[in-house]
Amino acid sequence: MRFYIGLMAALMLTSILRTDSASVDQTGAEGGLALIERVIRQRDAADVKPVARTNEGPGRDPAPCCQHPIETCCRR
């Protein structure tokens, strides 16, 4: 009887491990693509050059504005 219980436990454990390893492979591939996309977005954001504001003058903040197409606010 103990042999059959041990055998069933071993079979259940192997099936669980196979399922986990398959899901790791799938998420690993998707995670790799997400990582590449994130690195490309960070690189593109780093390529943005700040430009001077056109409304510089007394009482104005001369900080450069960010001209990124996604961001509309100025960085300070």
Swiss-Prot record:
Entry GO MF terms: ion channel regulator activity; toxin activity
Keyword tRNA processing: no
GO cellular component term of the entry, any: extracellular region
Prosegment location in residue numbers: 23-42
Compartment annotation: Secreted
In-chain residues carrying the UniProt-annotated modification 4-hydroxyproline: P50, P58, P62, P64
Modification after translation (UniProt): Contains 2 disulfide bonds that can be either 'C1-C3, C2-C4' or 'C1-C4, C2-C3', since these disulfide connectivities have been observed for conotoxins with cysteine framework V (for examples, see AC P0DQQ7 and AC P81755). Five different peptides have been described after total venom examination by HPLC-MS. Cal5a is the longest. Cal5b-Cal5e are identical in length but are differentially hydroxylated. It is possible that hydroxylation and proteolysis at position 53 are incomplete in some of these peptides.
Expression (tissue specificity): Expressed by the venom duct.
Signal peptide, first to last residue: 1-22
Superkingdom field: Eukaryota
Keywords attached to this entry: Disulfide bond, Hydroxylation, Ion channel impairing toxin, Neurotoxin, Secreted, Signal, Toxin
Role description: Probable neurotoxin with unknown target. Possibly targets ion channels.
Other notes: Cal5a-cal5e are found in dissected venom (DV).
Domain remark in the UniProt entry: The cysteine framework is V (CC-CC).
Protein name: Conotoxin Cal5a L1
Organism whose genome encodes this protein: Californiconus californicus (California cone)
